[in-house]
Amino acid sequence: MSRLDSFITRMQAQRDGLNFLKDKVDGLPGPILEIGLGNGRSYDHLRQLFPGRDIYVFERKVAAHPDCIPPDDRLFTGDVQESLPRAARQLGQRAALVHTDLGTGEHEAHMAMGVWLGPSIDLLVGPGGYVYSNQPLAVARWEQLPNPPGVPADRYYLYRAR
């Protein structure tokens, strides 16, 4: 698969998965978390799906389109290994949805990231909350769910906290 095709597949998986989760998340209390702002596309999509909902964003260094940058009080900057525990102290374990699209472009490093990322996210996701991740995450209190329709296996992973 070309890099362009891979990018398009990833973007479709993001959109389709977030759209699939909209009705499920609407009935849950708590904020939405976007881990990895990048260019701000999925954050912008989350704002459209969940108007009026608190959306907190995590990004090492913001370089997104100006229209897609969250307000300062909803933005955690710096290394995500440090900002996730900081956010957990501030927000608690109550997120209704956590969407993460982090990666290094290198398979082994990407998989290693998932080892610490899952437990870090678990500090934030509330009971019954959803985690939609571009990497496999192993957390004991989460149940892995089937992927949303149209989302290829091993492209994204869907979990629900117990």
Question: Which residue stretches match the model-derived regions?
Answer:
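Glycine-rich SAM-binding Motif I of class I
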Residues: 40-44
